[in-house]
Regions:
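Catalytic beta/alpha-barrel core
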Residues: 6, 145, 161-172, 182-195, ...
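Catalytic alpha/beta core domains of metabolic enzymes, predominantly
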Residues: 203-303
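Glycine-rich, proline-tolerant flexible connector loops at the mouths of alpha/beta enzymes
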Residues: 129-147, 305-315
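Active-site mouth loops of central-metabolism enzymes
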Residues: 8, 97-115, 138-143, 163-167, ...
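Alpha-helix-loop-beta-strand connector modules within alpha/beta enzyme cores
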Residues: 142-166, 200-206, 256-270, 316-339
Length: 349
């Protein structure tokens, strides 16, 4: 349950409520908002009558969350969560959509990575993405350079100022990845790796959580709940496509409807990944447009300096000239949505 305190509730009022909740075995999370202090009480509500809390000094009202993802629920927090970085970049709410671009895997050619990063920075992108540890279906496929790739990403950040997004696959690598990355990505295959979710929940880094290829929206939000429950509220959701019976023309089925559904159910920001969502280079632009129109807070796109020689996912990667053209058109569309129609990309109700 959620206890919303009065505007003029004192510190003593708040402490009295939290002490009572703790006595009855609740896990208590206190949020000090601009107007009201909100107390999340996680536990068995049958152990304590809500009427007892409601009668306490300083309590304005009590709300009960309908969905099992209590912390991620819009019922708990009506305002959009906005994740702000030290360089001023903001993800979520009515802020301009962000772009996370880069190769599927960081390769030995650092100059190629820097070429992509430099172009992305010049265009106005905010994040450089690239895999250091890659989960591959086949054991014979390239599975990443490990720490060497992380060093390349960090070096590119130094030269361009872009924030680094990279995937964490194993709890054992958490400290290593955190040393280099600005944002930790939990990939689709690990969406229900609960030990990993618990670990990233205890670190102080923003997390991009990708939807599993066969996961429902409820399962997706419950995965985010694991991260939130363990203390990390800096979660960015990512729709990246579902497995489908029809994989002849697309690698996955990109669930565009998930964006407005999640915007309604949750306060967390959500981005789209049309590269993995379709697996086809020519579909990246139209599906990115579709995602932005329905409210996505950003787009993740695979960009390679030479897709024909990419060690992984070249077929779904844009070249730098292609990305420049796509980015320019997407930016024009974003401007139109904001200025001509007075819309906000966050799809507020």
């Amino acid at each position: 349950m959620i206890i919303i305190m009065e505007r003029d509730a004192t510190a003593e009022n708040i402490k009295a409520v939290t002490d009572l909740l703790n006595e009855h075995g609740f896990r208590v999370i206190v949020h000090e908002g601009d107007v009201h202090t909100v107390i999340d009480a996680l536990g068995d509500k049958t152990t304590l009558s809500p009427n007892r809390i409601d009668a306490m000094d300083g309590v304005m009202k009590i709300k009960f969350i309908r969905e099992p993802f209590r912390l991620a629920s819009r019922d708990r927090k009506s305002d959009d969560t906005i994740i702000e970085f030290s360089n001023g970049v903001k993800v979520g709410g009515a802020n301009r959509p962000v772009f996370m671009v880069g190769p599927c895997s960081v390769e030995e050619d650092y100059e190629g990575l820097l070429e992509v990063a430099t172009a992305a920075k010049e265009l106005g992108c905010q994040f450089l993405r690239g895999g250091a540890f890659k989960p591959r279906t086949s054991p014979y496929d390239f599975d990443g350079l490990g720490e060497k790739a992380l060093k390349y990403l960090a070096q590119a950040r130094e030269e361009t100022g872009l924030l680094v997004v990279t995937e964490l696959m194993d709890v054992e690598d958490l400290d290593l990845v955190c040393d280099y990355a600005d944002v930790i990505q939990v990939g689709a295959r690990n969406m229900q790796n609960f030990r990993l979710l618990k670990a990233v929940g205890k670190c102080n880094k923003p997390v991009v959580l990708k939807r599993g290829p066969a996961s429902t929206i409820r399962e997706f939000l419950l995965a985010a709940e694991h991260i939130l429950y363990n203390g990390n509220e800096q979660v960015i959701l990512c729709e990246r496509g579902l497995k489908s019976f029809d994989n002849v023309f697309t690698r996955n089925l990109m669930d565009i409807s998930a964006v407005p559904v999640i915007k309604k159910l949750s306060h967390l920001p959500i981005i789209v990944d049309p590269s993995h969502g379709t697996g086809q280079r020519y579909l990246i632009e139209p599906m990115a447009k579709a995602g932005l129109v329905v409210g996505a807070d950003g787009v993740m796109v695979e960009v390679h300096h030479n897709p024909a020689t990419a060690l992984s996912d070249g077929k779904q990667s844009l070249s730098i000239p292609q990305f420049k053209e796509v980015f320019t058109r997407l930016n024009k569309m974003i401007d139109t949505l904001h200025l001509e129609h007075g819309m906000t990309i966050s799809n507020e109700e």
